[in-house]
Amino acid sequence: IRTTRGDVVVRLYPEWAPSTVANFIALAQSGYFDGNRWFRIVPNFVAQTGDPTGDPDSEAGYTIPAEENPVEQRSGIIAMGLDYKDNKPLRDSAGTQFYITLSPQPYLGRDFSVFGEVESGFDVIANLIESDRMTLVRRIADD
């Protein structure tokens, strides 16, 4: 993930969330994320992006099923954003928006499909502001 602040390398885990990883790779390879703004930055919580309009309430026009896994949401975890109703996350409402945790978030639980983590460049994510953008998102290796 190339951002206006620097580069971030993430490791995706298809063994945790195969459909979510496939969705993310397809979006990245198509250029869908290129130019997207980091529209939600909450210090010590999350940095969120993945919508070309920069609107956290925007919908992708499709959803993917939630993929529950036992991974704790520690710092640098990548998971899918969800819609909410009555202050509760709606499972199976993920599409294109994702977030990266800026600190451990164990209370987020298993409703959110965790599909990867930051391998290098966490300092870039930790210093993002809401006007920053992803300039290029591509898959660089198969391993």
Can you say where each PLM-predicted feature lies in the sequence?
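Cyclophilin-like peptidyl-prolyl cis-trans isomerases
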Residues: 1-143
